Amino acid sequence: MSWWQVISLAVVQGLTEFLPVSSSGHLAVVSRVFFSDDAGASFTAVTQLGTEAAVLVYFARDIVRILRAWFDGLVVKSHRNADYRLGWYVIIGTIPICVLGLLFKDEIRSGVRNLWVVATALVVFSGVIALAEYLGRQSRHVEQLTWRDGLVVGVAQTLALVPGVSRSGSTISAGLFLGLDRELAARFGFLLAIPAVFASGLFSLPDAFHPVTEGMSATGPQLLVATLIAFVVGLAAVSWFLRFLLRHSMYWFVGYRVVVGVVVLILLATGTVAAT
C-alpha cells in the first residue's frame, strides 16, 4: 500500500466508525473505487484499534466508574448498582459477536466483502434504521436496562460482521426498538463494541502484514500511522456524533446510505467497478 492509500483509508475509518454508515463498507468501497483493490478485513480490524482507543479516551470516566462498580459489586452484594449491572450487560452483549466472529472468520474476510453485498446492505439496512427511528419510544434510561437488553443489542452487533450494515447503526437501532433514548442507545453500543473490536484487531494484526492473506498489504509503520490517524479522527467523530444525537435523528444518515448504496450498485451494474 502507498502512504496516500494508508492515510486516506485511515481518515475514512476514523470518520465512519461511529456513524451509522458502516466503516468497513466505506473502506471496501473507497479501496475499490479509488485504489482498485480492497484493503482487506484485517487492515480494517487493525485500524479499528485506533478508533476504539478513541472510545476509551472519550468514555474514560464512564469505563473507570463501571469497572469499579463491577468489581465492588462482586465483593459486596449491597453495592450492586446500575453501573455494576451495566458491566454485566456489556459482558453478556459481547458474547454473540465473539462466537459468530470466530465461526465465520473466513467468510468475513472474503465473501461478504463483495461490493454487491456492501451496497445492498447499505440500502436495505437504511430501512431498518428509519423504522427504528419511527417506532422507538425513547422512554427508557440507563437505570432501566436489563440483561435482556444487553443480549438483544449484542445480537444486533453481530450484524456488523457484514460490511455495509454498520455496528453503530445496528446497535443504536436495536436500542431504539427496545425503547432506549437515542443517546443511551449510542453510548451503550459504543461501550459494547470495545471488547469485541480490540479482540478482533489483535487477532487480525499478523494477517494485516501479508498480501497473500487478503487485499492490499501494509508495513508496520504504515499500520501504526493508520491507527494513530484513525484515533485522532475517530475521537473528533464520536464527540460530534453524540452531540448530534442530542438534537437530531438518524434520518440524515438513512438518506446518505441510500445514495451511496445506489451509486455503488450503478457502478457495479455498468462494470465501472469490480465487485471483488
Curated annotation (Swiss-Prot):
Enzyme Commission numbers on file: 3.6.1.27
Mode of membrane association: Multi-pass membrane protein
Compartments in which it is found: Cell membrane
GO biological processes: cell wall organization; peptidoglycan biosynthetic process; regulation of cell shape; response to antibiotic
Pfam families: BacA
Top EC class of this enzyme: hydrolase
Superkingdom, taxonomy of origin: Bacteria
Keyword Metal-binding: no
GO molecular function, one term: undecaprenyl-diphosphatase activity
TM region(s), chain numbering: 84-104, 115-135, 188-208, 222-242, 250-270
Reactions this protein catalyses: di-trans,octa-cis-undecaprenyl diphosphate + H2O = di-trans,octa-cis-undecaprenyl phosphate + phosphate + H(+)
UniProt entry keywords in alphabetical sequence: Antibiotic resistance, Cell membrane, Cell shape, Cell wall biogenesis/degradation, Hydrolase, Membrane, Peptidoglycan synthesis, Transmembrane, Transmembrane helix
A GO cellular component annotation in the UniProt record: plasma membrane
Primary location recorded for the protein, binned into one broad class: membrane
Family from the record: Belongs to the UppP family.
Function: Catalyzes the dephosphorylation of undecaprenyl diphosphate (UPP). Confers resistance to bacitracin.
Additional information: Bacitracin is thought to be involved in the inhibition of peptidoglycan synthesis by sequestering undecaprenyl diphosphate, thereby reducing the pool of lipid carrier available.
Name of protein: Undecaprenyl-diphosphatase
Organism per entry: Mycobacterium ulcerans (strain Agy99)
